[in-house]
From Swiss-Prot:
GO biological process: poly(3-hydroxyalkanoate) biosynthetic process; poly-hydroxybutyrate biosynthetic process
Catalytic residues of the enzyme: C150 (charge relay system), D305 (charge relay system), H334 (charge relay system)
Stated name of the protein: Poly(3-hydroxyalkanoate) polymerase subunit PhaC
Keyword Transferase: yes
UniProt xrefs under NCBIfam families: PHA_synth_III_C (TIGR01836)
Organism lineage: Archaea, Methanobacteriati, Methanobacteriota, Stenosarchaea group, Halobacteria
Gene (name only): phaC
Length: 492
């Protein structure tokens, strides 16, 4: 290339770029109208319950029949919940409705200065519990499905551990649960060496949404302050792209404050001290005992989630006694779990199938209870086991009668049935041993472990050595000591 042709080629490219700039700039004015007209959260719903700022939404059904067990979505206390109903073709709410579910959602609203002293105790044991009871009453079900997103997933775990009889299946979407050098940037920034939640709440009261927004944006500053706007300019002539971009920006800028005491409690107890994963968290004077989580549990995680890395979620399944746990991992990020086209093409159909298999009542059939991990993207490994088409009903709740009671049979006065002989084995001056599961913190799993070392009653537990038992059944000494103290109090 000669100097002349080089100069001419350079000039040609400059003119082409200038022309392209003019075209994009011209389109920008047209797209400004598009930005101002986008709408979000348009799936029809009605408010069926209100308390303080909270609204419980019930969505209009999309199918003639619905599954017996409804789904209550518990959203985070940060940002608005319409990220789950951002647009019709990328709406978690719509997807669940179209699959035949009866869907409810908690919209927390925004706390006022009067709500500064609300705690996790209030949100979990009062607000969520009241909403669950409303859904139970309306559906006629003793237990319902919970689907918690982000912080809402963490609170759903707390609730399910405190009220396991009310939760049939537990879905956790990008839920921060285990913070043992597994929580990524947020855990590092929030380390008590460098960060004091109390100092923030002392200064602000409620934590301002602007404060939270800047913190989240700084986790990926190049993407949030440069790259996404370059991408917008490059696609400004694409109306669909601009609409999607505008909806996301509307949601990102529509933040809400967080009640001060709740923020402080959540950061200190869950992030900094990892109390939830260590089974040491207390709410409303009660232990949030992970040993009570025996219901089916589904973890929905994003492979590229920089807010809640998969490592802060997946290990939780090893901390609970549930024999029916599963992980569905999508090749996306934190927000992409709810709005990306890939998630709605692969991930949410798999999630819907999981709930469907466990949301019919009235039979004894249950899905296979093996712990498994699936990846619903195109690179997922295929397995030999695939769920049968259609619905797989779950066994009836424990407090429901599956079969009719047999008619009582008349027994002659001089005859004794076999069933009547059994309780007579206890002498008149003896009482049957008290069940181990009556001790707070002991569920079927721990009861089985204790039985393996010869402890089958409360009196036997009261006489046990906590250190020896803890080492044998692989349970913290502090937990066994608490059990022994409870048992001793009952046998004194």
């Amino acid at each position: 290339m000669t100097p002349v042709t080089f100069a001419l080629d350079l000039q040609r490219r400059q003119w082409e770029q200038a022309a392209e700039l003019v075209d994009r700039t011209s389109a920008a004015s047209d797209r400004a109208e598009t930005v101002s007209e986008v709408s979000v959260g348009k799936t029809p719903n009605e408010v069926v319950y209100k308390e303080n700022k909270l609204r419980l939404l019930h969505y209009e059904s999309k199918t003639e029949t619905q599954y017996d067990v409804p789904i209550l979505i518990v959203y985070a206390l940060i940002n608005r919940p319409y990220i789950l109903d951002l647009q019709p073709d990328r709406s978690v709410v719509q997807t669940l409705l179209e699959q035949g579910f009866d869907v409810y959602l908690i919209d927390w609203g925004e706390p006022s200065r009067l709500d500064t002293h609300l705690t996790l105790d209030d949100y979990v044991t009062r607000y969520i519990d009241n909403c669950v009871d409303i859904v139970r009453d309306r559906s006629g079900q003793d237990s319902i499905n919970l689907l918690g997103y982000c912080m809402g997933g963490t609170m759903s775990v707390m609730y399910a551990a405190l009220f396991p009889e009310k939760v049939r299946n537990l879905g956790l979407m990008a839920a921060g649960l285990v913070f043992d050098d597994t929580g990524g940037v947020l855990e590092r920034w929030g380390d008590e060496q460098y960060y004091s939640p109390k100092a923030v709440t002392d200064a602000f009261g409620n934590v301002p949404s602007e404060f939270l927004d800047v913190g989240f944006a700084l986790m990926d500053p190049v993407e949030n302050f440069v790259t996404k706007y370059v991408r917008l300019f490059e696609n400004v002539e694409n109306e669909s792209f601009v609409e999607n971009f505008s909806r996301m920006e509307q949601w990102l800028s529509d933040g809400i404050d967080v009640a001060g005491e709740t923020y402080k409690q959540f950061l200190e107890d869950v992030y900094q001290q990892n109390k939830l994963a260590q089974n040491e968290l207390m709410l409303d004077g009660k232990q949030v005992d992970l040993e009570r989580l025996e219901m089916p549990i589904l973890q929905i995680v994003g492979e590229y989630d920089h807010l809640i890395p998969p490592e802060a979620s997946k290990p939780f399944n090893d901390l609970v006694p549930s024999e029916d746990t599963e992980v569905i991992e999508g090749a996306t990020g934190h927000i992409g779990l709810s709005v990306s086209s890939r998630s709605h093409g692969d991930l949410w159909p798999a999630v819907s199938d999981w709930f469907a298999e466990r949301s019919e009542t009235g039979t004894d059939e249950t899905p296979d209870s093996e712990t498994e991990e699936t990846r619903p993207d195109s690179q997922a490994e295929e397995t030999d086991e695939t769920p049968d088409e259609g619905l797989k009903p779950q066994a009836a709740a424990s407090n429901e009668t599956v079969a009719e009671e047999p008619e009582p049979q008349v027994v002659e006065s001089n005859e004794t049935t076999e069933e009547e002989l059994e309780p007579q084995a206890v002498e008149a001056n003896e009482t049957a041993p008290e069940e181990l599961e009556s001790i707070d913190g002991i569920g079927p799993t721990y009861a089985e472990r204790l039985a393996s070392v010869g402890i089958t009653s409360v009196s036997g537990l009261a006489a046990a050595d906590p250190s020896e038992i803890a080492a044998t059944i692989d349970v913290p000494v502090s937990r066994v000591t608490a059990w022994v103290e409870q048992a001793s109090d009952r046998t004194d």
